[in-house]
Amino acid sequence: MIRYSSAAVRAVHRQEQDEARQLLDSAGELLREIDGDLAEHERLLHAGFVHDAQKEFAEGCITLALICEKALPGPETLGISNASYLDGLGESVGELRRYILDSLRREDLSRCEEMLTVMDAIYGVLLTMDFPELLAHGLRHTTDTIRGVIERTRGDLTVSLRQRKLKARLNDLG
């Protein structure tokens, strides 16, 4: 499931949305199998490896939705726990940074500001979450890390925009 979800995120960055959807569909099928197989084994169902798999699945689904400008799926729709969903939401911020950096390299700034705003919004939502660490599986650390990711991205975007303006002015002079 983690492999499918990770491959889906890579497909999103290659702009292969159909492949990403297929991979996430496969991951979703495995998730339903896991839920069915472990339904009578609560301790295993709530073990860390299931949480990690759900988190990766959430990250893939959220990243695909945000980049493709689709409605954000909720944890109920994905069939995962709230804690896994929030962790996946936090992890998607790093994928949005990658999307922005890839866009800057392609000199396509059309959605960079929008994605930075989305990153800020995710951070704002995660700041309001107050789960015990036992349930949140590192969400507080993820939230703390996100702030730095956003600020580095903001700096990279600002430098790129300023360089673009400088280049345009130099072309006007030349």
What are these regions, as identified by a protein language model?
Residues 5, 9-12, 31-38, 57, ...:
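A structural signal for well-ordered alpha-helices, especially hydrophobic packing surfaces
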Residues 12-19, 104-110:
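Short helix-adjacent coil turns
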Residues 16, 21-23, 33-42, 127-134, ...:
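Charged, alpha-helix-forming regions
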Residues 23, 49, 53-56, 82-85, ...:
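Amphipathic alpha-helix face/heptad-repeat signature
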Residues 60-110, 115, 129, 160-163, ...:
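Long, charged alpha-helical scaffolding segments
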